[in-house]
Amino acid sequence: LLVLLSALPLLWPDVPPLLDLPGHMGRYRVQLDGSTSPALQHYYSFEWRLIGNLGIDLLVMPLAAVFGLELAVKLIVITIPALTVAGLLWVAREVHGRIPPTALFAVPFAYNFPFLFGFVNYALSMALALLAFGLWLRLARLGHTRLRAMLMLPLSVLLWVCHAFGWGTLGVLAFSAELVRQFDRGRGLFMAGLVAAWHCLALAPPIALMLLWRSSGSRGVTADYLNFDAKLDWLRMALRDRWEYFDQTCLALTGLVIFWAMVSRRIHFSRNLAASVLFLSLVFMALPRIVFGSAYADMRLAPYLVAVALIAIRFPEGIRPGFMKGVAAVALAFVLVRTAAATVSMVLYDRSFDRNLAALDHVPPGARLVSFVGRNCREPWAMSRLLHLPGMAIVRRHAFSNDQWTMAGAQLLDVRYRDAWPFMRDPSEVVTPRPCRREVWLTANEAMAHFPRDAFDYVWLIDPPPFDPGFASDLQPIWRSGTSTLYRVPRPKLDPKLRRTPSAG
């Protein structure tokens, strides 16, 4: 029931309102229709490569053929929290022999900040890593270590292809669990570590794939090590959604539960999962902010670290049933409150998405569209999640959008439309009310003044900051909702050969 309940917040929105997801959906559209759409061929190129970040990119191929792209993405994204909850509860059951009531406090971490940020391949890989870890523990408990090795060889490759971080996390979890298992069988710590490493060789094949990927010309950098102030912020934001005090109170409650387990004589931690928490903590501290050009690498691990600590709490056999029921009631209430809040938050974000996406009804197929999305130098707790909404212009209109990510070796998509320079790619869609330190974002005035008029047919402003209206005096407004506006650029005419109605879905 908890697995099914975790899908509830995402049932209503037609486009899951996750920050980066519309941008990814734009790439999926190019991937699916780029070979048959003259407009998409003109604006973008797409080249398949084996990289450790292909989870949903591969899943949409068969599902979009059946359901259409938008519904296919929604169905996949809905499964991510459900799989995460299933993985957490399975691991708890394998370690404790039953699901302790405190494990329920980990359930809301399925809707963690990295997931809401739109790191969907990462979140999917972490959900699958938890499920694979549950299988690892079960087969060890049953004594089927040879079967486990045979299964983990292909599973590790599939997990790496989904996202390399999920594979790495599974390796950390598996090694720590096997270390404790070997230690409990009477081996010294050093020998237990060697034997655990031997068992984990079944997870090693993706190392060759990683080396091949990194030697193929990827320019992704790794940087910003040991930024402990940021790491504390990432922990504080583990449940970040919409209401700061509510989210912080909920996180504080889970912190109190963990602290209670540390000092209580009634309950304690499983040594198996305590070792996992220790190793994950070391990885979290050592991870830089940027890995292979992928930002927020350490931030992504923070909520899973807390969730594993929660499922590590163990109740001894002789504890009173009434006490267990009381803890279970509090934990279940916590799950229901967080689920209700996440559902309301998703509905509100969905309204914001729908209000702005109405502009696309006025954009012809194949249009050359430049978009500017407002944000502040310092984002409020409740992020707007609109920064990559322009990607939906690719999905629904086969239009050009300047929000796509490009990085040699790390992205499958590249931008061909050089006339748009420097408004070709992310983050040229971001505009701010004033210059921001250490950022390359333009102010709204700079963007409106300098985008090349002859390269675009339409300008889409999405919740922009105030700007000098004189910079839009040569543009024709054709749609408006609040401060969001769609302008037509009068002079350029759309090349007739690019007018092709996109397929449904």
Positions of PLM-derived features:
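Short hydrophobic/aromatic helix or loop-helix immediately within or flanking a transmembrane segment
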Residues: G26-D33, Y44-L69
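Transmembrane-helix signature of polytopic, membrane-embedded enzymes
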Residues: L88-A110
